[in-house]
Regions:
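Short, Lys/Arg-rich, polar N-terminal cytosolic tail immediately upstream
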Residues: 2, 6-30
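The first (N-terminal) embedded transmembrane alpha-helix
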Residues: 30-51
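Loop-to-helix transition at the N-terminal end of transmembrane alpha-helices
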Residues: 57-75
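Membrane-helix interface/capping segments
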Residues: 78-96, 119-127, 159
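Juxtamembrane helix-capping/reentrant segments at transmembrane boundaries
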Residues: 89-109
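Transmembrane alpha-helix/helix-exit interface in multi-pass inner-membrane proteins
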Residues: 144-166
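Membrane-proximal soluble regions of multi-pass membrane proteins
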Residues: 161-163, 167-206
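Pore domain of cation channels
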Residues: 188-195, 203-243
Length: 243
């Protein structure tokens, strides 16, 4: 059966030891998820503190911090996506790292919360920094939240794909059948995640795992919510700027 053969050939083809992973170049690959979160929070805090002398709404200050946090997280992610090889992702997925789940939940909740904050800010009429400046901050927040959402799910799909198969720990779960690609890298998973984010469907990649299918369902629903809010915010901004 194609699915079974695919799973075994892909899983065994990427099997590698912890030593091989640790010897791979790049300290960033070995940096725990929680440390990336802490560093990004530190960047956001420093920038927000540096802007304390400037008079602005507290929520505007928080939004600037959120933009810095999001950009920092995406820089980490971009560097990892472009440099990490499939066999490294496989070993990473085998590690018991509860911090990854915690970071995923925290950042996902913060991303959703940022949209609520942006909607509240758009009702503000004080514009202490000027209408155009604050509008730019809010739009940047929406864009950062959108990219960060799909970046989070890129990580999730990759770790689910390369996690141990429950019936055979020597192979990985797979769960996604990517045409002509047995050993996908992070950019393949980014393609899958961002296509769902933009179209609410999975295009040419077939889902064969119940767990990934459920994650994709949640991802699609959140993407629909985000895109609906983005359209509403865009209309609000255009009307507000014309008034």
């Amino acid at each position: 059966m194609f699915g079974t053969n695919f799973l075994r050939s892909a899983g065994k083809g990427l099997n590698c030891s912890m030593a091989e992973y640790l010897n791979c170049p790049g300290w960033l690959h070995r940096l725990p998820s929680i440390y990336k979160l802490i560093i990004s929070l530190a960047v956001a805090t420093i920038v927000s503190a540096a802007l304390m002398p400037i008079k602005m709404e507290n929520m505007t200050r928080v939004m600037i911090g959120w933009d810095c946090f999001s950009v920092s997280m995406m820089i980490f992610s971009g560097l990892i996506f472009l440099s990490m090889r499939p066999r490294q992702i496989r070993v990473l997925a085998k590690q018991e790292d509860a911090g990854r789940i915690v970071v995923f939940g925290i950042v996902l909740a913060a991303t959703i919360g940022s949209l609520v904050g942006i909607m509240l800010l758009l009702g503000n009429k004080d514009w202490l920094l000027g209408k155009s400046v604050e509008t730019f901050i809010y739009i940047s927040g929406v864009i950062c939240s959108w990219f960060l959402l799909h970046t989070l799910f890129t990580y999730r799909y990759a770790l689910l794909y390369y996690g141990d198969h429950p019936l055979d720990p020597d192979t990985h779960t797979v769960g996604l059948q990517i045409p002509n690609e047995l050993w996908p890298d992070y950019l393949d998973f980014a393609y899958f995640a961002f296509v769902i984010g933009m179209t609410f469907q999975v295009s040419d990649i077939e889902i064969s795992s119940r767990t990934i299918r459920r994650v994709a369902l949640v991802h699609g629903l959140l993407s629909f919510l985000f895109n609906t809010v983005i359209v509403a915010l865009t209309i609000n901004v255009v009307v507000d700027l014309k008034s």
